[in-house]
């Protein structure tokens, strides 16, 4: 029988809330939930609680919302919970060493990649962009480095050719909670010793998943069709891959791409040239192969299948014309 652990949970979005729900339903005790202060949201800029706070309130769990942990009073407040362990999932705040060392078993983190690959802020997006065939979650012991701590447990899943960041996020949100509970089962054993179980990361194999910037969404047709397809999938639901269409009179429109597919093309059209436009989609030449745009979004409109857009805008997508790179 597992000895229940007293846990401080720190996390913010729905992804974190799904992990918190698994802990609430486990044999362990959640002594407090930490999340950032409420933020203005919506048109009315009303202060809105994050997903983890709402779940904690629903289950009568104490909620703490420090701005950061630079304040000694906040550090002491956390220590008063006398937690066995702190679980961190998409929290968004840096933890100083005094916090990392406060719980008896330290702090563990659920990271959205198989470490040491894709350390950093955007592991899901970067794994898609790179064309990885597998990804997963790693439960690691946190240290003062960026995702450099020893690995306790990992779980893998396949990346399908149709996966987007949104669908892969859901896969990991289903994978992570089980991996987390299994990790806590290991750590709750009376004879658990990190030195006998944890595995150090090989820094030479590490890659960095830098935070996404909205400027990356601007498609450059000098990439191959395969590379562009991966970028489109990686940038859903944000920032969404985009290109600019220029009308004959010079007016520009920014269009977003929500679905596309790679096609074989062995012609010599310049990259960015429309080589086909029909109910199947708008096919654009690249440096290698062609990209068929299947679902796009016009400015101020909802995303639609290309066949529906061509009914009213066929003059925009004439075979032989060129789609511009943004900027």
Swiss-Prot record:
Protein name: Methionyl-tRNA formyltransferase
Taxonomy, superkingdom: Bacteria
Key words of the record: Protein biosynthesis, Transferase
Sequence positions that bind (6S)-5,6,7,8-tetrahydrofolate: 113-116
Database matches in Gene3D superfamilies: Formyl transferase, C-terminal domain, Formyl transferase, N-terminal domain
Function of the molecule: Attaches a formyl group to the free amino group of methionyl-tRNA(fMet). The formyl group appears to play a dual role in the initiator identity of N-formylmethionyl-tRNA by promoting its recognition by IF2 and preventing the misappropriation of this tRNA by the elongation apparatus.
SUPFAM superfamilies hit by this protein: FMT C-terminal domain-like (SSF50486), Formyltransferase (SSF53328)
Enzyme class: transferase
Species the sequence originates in: Colwellia psychrerythraea (strain 34H / ATCC BAA-681)
